[in-house]
Curated annotation (Swiss-Prot):
Predominant location: cytoplasm
Family according to the record: Belongs to the class-I aminoacyl-tRNA synthetase family. ValS type 2 subfamily.
Protein role: Catalyzes the attachment of valine to tRNA(Val). As ValRS can inadvertently accommodate and process structurally similar amino acids such as threonine, to avoid such errors, it has a 'posttransfer' editing activity that hydrolyzes mischarged Thr-tRNA(Val) in a tRNA-dependent manner.
Binding positions for ATP per the UniProt entry: K524
Protein name (record): Valine--tRNA ligase
Positions in coiled-coil regions: none
Nucleus as UniProt keyword: no
NCBIfam families for this protein: PRK13208.1, valS
Source organism of the structure: Methanosarcina mazei (strain ATCC BAA-159 / DSM 3647 / Goe1 / Go1 / JCM 11833 / OCM 88)
GO cellular component, one term: cytosol
Span(s) of short sequence motif 'KMSKS' region: 521-525
One GO MF term: aminoacyl-tRNA deacylase activity
EC number: 6.1.1.9
């Protein structure tokens, strides 16, 4: 192969397009029937099909792909499936926006059709982005949660958990979004710091402070701290609520903070979670003052039909007019918002379906899982410890997995579908048997399942649960963002334990969020959003993947910086130049000769490079086993650029272009071994570039080849030390030439090396000079040859006379001036006047004489290098 046959410039887009068309994606397929190789199943995150595979998705999939490609090369039977989490609120909202409707304005089946159509189109768009980024997805194991083949498993899991007592139906307070008109889980509530007012109100015996005066209609008690002497006489007494007139009891509870407001608070149904605790603890009545649309109910009296903000202002006005409101103070508070639409949530009591939380089981399973990084486990532990309510899994939406339940119209009993009936929509199908009471008339469950009920069985699904395959649980790894530890990770562990009694995975790798170039979270409003397509179009997929690899360690947030992508693109060109140069010298090298190349034919610098190469293989293997992508790729890039290109190639050019056939063949063997190994090491990270490199070594894909093995016989600290000496000597000689303005290939009369025994051939070739190893120690005479005045001292002190002093100094005998410096004072005569100078005012330049020759001495640790002029 000649250098001219390989293009000088690396055209990334052309190469990437070529391999996208050529690759046979079946090489990424998981073999369900094989047990000879260890399995490596990845519980891939199924993103919402929004149509936009955003940069945060792309970063996470880079991590997943690094692992998948690496594990295949390590001999694992890898499954890298791709799923799509279709159901849920985002899709419904988008359909409503697109068609200018609300979900209740069209038939249920028609609305579901619109959602499916939008979702299918979005999946196609996102799939193309994933292919463009070179992700080695096993598309034969793709799953789509809106398809019956998947949601039948969601329904089966519901049926089994219900029958096993893990799921129940109950009228219970839940978080409610009035805008979306659905219950939401605590994990879906986001909090924002906001400004409100604390209102001070006269009740008939005590004064209370509240931020929710609109809930006075739902006041069912007043609470004070039992240690608060201000109110001890009223504990157990009835108090009348102003404006609304109901009588409530004043109770004592330790949870009341005497220092807050007046020290007396309303208990309403429901203003916050604390109200729910007190309501349950004291068996208080339930008054529903707010409906599902966020409007005041009949219980609010004349305020019925008002929105919550309207009612709040009206009540405050009426309290003020009646003399009950006597003060208001500004207050900062955390407001719970719907994760999707940012509407303030309410707590309503509605019949809902719940999953029981097994706190101890989840924490025990979390301890059995390897966390990368380890500290991320604390987030799950903290969340589990704060869970007070069970998981509300019913949603008042349409586009989601139907709950396979009917209610008997005669006796009200629940009829749950049998597994053989699934998949089923109770709104379109009736039960296939009568109720125990004999009735055949049923009311279908119109609520649907929380989308996390779909995605929390992904580990089970990809492991073969309820399929024709044997169950392979646990999966080996779950890669995900830290923002969904309390949802996806938590719910998946819960469900795997409930359904199979096993942890879902062996390990979990957490990635951070992607920040914009300005360091802030990417958002359209800030104008700092970067799309993966923008990067691949301007640079390349491999450049983008490099940014993903080196941008940060697992668990940390990663800032997107264009300069990192530019650096990545430059590395591709640099690596291509290294590869092109190496291949141009391998046209007459037979790869078969590399199989049993005699190690005693290698030069010191050859052994140095091969030892470093094998240490690189050893370290990258260890780092990738620990999912340390940043340190791994930086090490590979540093080796290629600094060790191989900047040093080894410069040192062996003399052999490559010279007449010494044996020396040239040794260098060829090293180049062949190193470039081929680098193509394998780079394959998980920059698959297109690595494939292009490897294609000139082998007709098979690099992605079907084995990861390099460490050759311990080539690892030698002695060889590395000797090689470092050769590298350092050559580098110092090249710097010496540069300082003198000489061309780097300009010959020197002679280079003498003392105090070490090393190969000199490569030094001679790299410096284009005669090199001789010398025995013994050199002797040097340092002869003063020039007086160099220090104008930094003389100028400011003598000003206009400085020039004359400089001239006089230069006329002095350098040896005489050196002797005066040793005495501590220099005297010089200028225009008949003697002037005394401090030693710092001059410098003596000396020539080094060795054996009667003028020489220069280079300072190198472990050796003395003499340059004969």
């Amino acid at each position: 192969m000649t250098e001219s046959e390989i293009p000088k410039e690396y055209n990334a887009n052309e190469v990437e397009k070529k391999w996208m068309e050529k690759w046979n994606l079946s090489m990424y397929h998981f073999n369900w029937g094989e047990d000879t190789r260890p399995q490596y199943i990845i519980d891939t995150p199924p993103p919402y099909p929004t149509g936009n595979f955003h940069i945060g998705n792309a970063l996470n999939w880079c991590y997943i792909d690094f692992v998948a490609r690496y594990k295949r090369m390590r001999g694992y039977n890898v499954m890298f499936p791709q799923g799509w989490d279709c159901h849920g609120l985002p899709t419904e909202v988008k359909v409503e926006e697109t068609h200018g409707i609300t979900k209740n304005q069209v038939p249920r089946a028609e609305f579901r059709r619109m959602c499916r159509e939008l979702t299918a189109g979005n999946i196609d768009k996102m799939r193309q982005t994933m292919l463009r980024l070179g992700f080695s997805v096993d598309w034969s194991n793709e799953f789509v949660t809106m398809e019956p083949s998947y949601f039948v498993k969601t329904q089966k899991s519901f049926v089994r958990m219900y029958n096993n007592g893990h799921i129940y139906h109950e009228d219970h307070p839940v978080n409610w979004c009035p805008r979306c008109e659905t219950a939401i889980a605590f994990a879906e509530v986001e909090y924002d710091q906001g400004q409100t007012k604390l209102n001070f109100v006269h009740f008939d015996k005590v004064d209370i402070a509240t931020t929710r005066p609109e809930l006075m209609a739902a006041c069912v008690a007043v609470a004070v701290n039992p240690e608060d002497e201000r109110y001890s006489q009223y504990i157990g007494k009835e108090i009348e609520v102003p404006l609304f007139g109901q009588k409530v009891t004043l109770i004592a509870d330790e949870a009341v903070e005497p220092e807050f407001g007046t020290g007396a608070v309303m208990i309403c149904t429901f203003g916050d979670k604390q109200d729910v605790r007190w309501w349950a603890k004291y068996g208080l009545p339930l008054i529903k003052a707010i409906d599902k649309q966020g409007r005041m109910t009949k219980a609010a009296g004349k305020y019925e039909g008002m929105s919550i903000p309207e009612c709040r202002q009206a009540v405050i006005s009426d309290l003020r007019d009646a003399g009950f409101l006597y003060n208001q103070k500004p207050l900062e508070q955390n407001v719970g918002l719907c994760w999707r639409c940012d509407t303030p949530i309410e707590i309503l009591s509605e019949p809902q379906w719940f999953v029981k939380i097994n706190h101890e089981g989840i924490l025990k399973a979390a301890d059995e899982i390897n966390w990368y990084p380890e500290y991320m486990k604390v987030r799950l532990q903290n969340w589990t410890g704060t869970m007070e309510w069970d998981w509300c899994i019913s949603r008042q939406r349409i586009f989601a997995t139907p709950i396979p339940i009917w209610y008997c119209k005669k006796c009200g009993e629940v009829m749950i579908a049998e597994e053989s009936w699934l998949p089923i929509d109770p709104n379109e199908n009736v039960p296939k048997k009568a109720c125990a009471c004999g009735s055949t008339e049923f009311e279908p469950e119109t609520d649907v399942l929380d989308t996390w009920m779909d995605s929390s069985i992904t580990a089970l699904h990809v492991s073969g649960w309820e399929s024709e395959h044997d169950l392979r649980l646990p999966a080996q790894i779950r890669p995900q963002g830290h923002d969904i530890i309390r949802t996806w990770a938590f719910y998946t562990i819960l469900r795997s334990l409930a359904l199979e009694g096993k942890r879902p995975w062996d390990s979990i790798v957490i990635n951070g969020m992607v920040l914009g170039p300005d360091g802030h979270k990417m958002s359209k409003s800030l104008g700092n959003v970067i799309s993966p397509e923008e990067v691949t179009t301007q640079y390349s997929a491999d450049a983008f993947r490099q940014w993903g690899a080196v941008g940060g360690s697992t668990g940390s947030d990663v800032m997107f910086r264009w300069k990192d992508v530019v650096s990545a693109s430059r590395f591709l060109q640099k690596m291509w130049s290294i590869y092109r140069f190496s291949m141009s010298h391998l046209k007459d090298f037979d790869p078969a000769d590399a199989e049993n190349f005699p190690p005693d034919s290698l030069y010191t610098i050859d052994r140095w490079l091969l030892s470093k190469l094998n240490r690189l293989v050893e370290s990258t293997t260890k780092e990738l086993d620990g999912y340390q992508f940043d340190s791994t790729f930086k090490a590979i890039r540093g080796f290629a650029w600094e060790v191989l290109a900047d040093n080894y190639l410069e040192l062996v050019k003399g052999r490559l272009y010279g007449e010494n056939k044996e020396g040239r063949k040794a260098a060829q063997y090293v180049l062949y071994t190193t470039t081929r190994t680098l193509s394998l090491l780079l394959a998980p990270f920059i698959p297109f570039f690595a494939e292009e490199m490897y294609s000139r070594f082998d007709s098979a894909s690099v992605h079907t080849r084995a990861w390099p093995a460490v050759n311990e016989s080539l690892m030698s600290e002695e060889a590395e030390a000797a090689g470092e000496m050769i590298k350092d000597i050559t580098g110092e000689v090249r710097r010496y030439k540069s300082d003198l303005g000489m061309a780097l290939n300009a010959p020197l009369k002679k280079i003498e090396i003392y105090n070490t025994q090393i190969d000199t051939g490569d030094i001679a070739g790299a410096t284009n000079s005669e090199v001789e190893l010398m025995e013994g120690a050199p002797s040097f005479d340092y002869v003063p040859v020039e007086v160099k005045p220090n104008m930094g001292i003389l100028g400011p002190r003598f000003r206009k006379d400085a020039g004359a002093i400089v001239k006089a100094l230069k006329a002095e005998d350098p040896a005489s001036v050196e002797a005066q410096i040793a005495s501590g004072r220099i005297t010089v005569t200028v225009n008949g006047e003697k002037i005394e100078l401090e030693p710092e005012a001059v410098e003596i330049r000396k020539e080094v004489i060795s054996g009667g020759r003028e020489v220069d001495v280079l300072d190198i640790k472990g050796a003395v290098v003499v340059i004969v002029r």
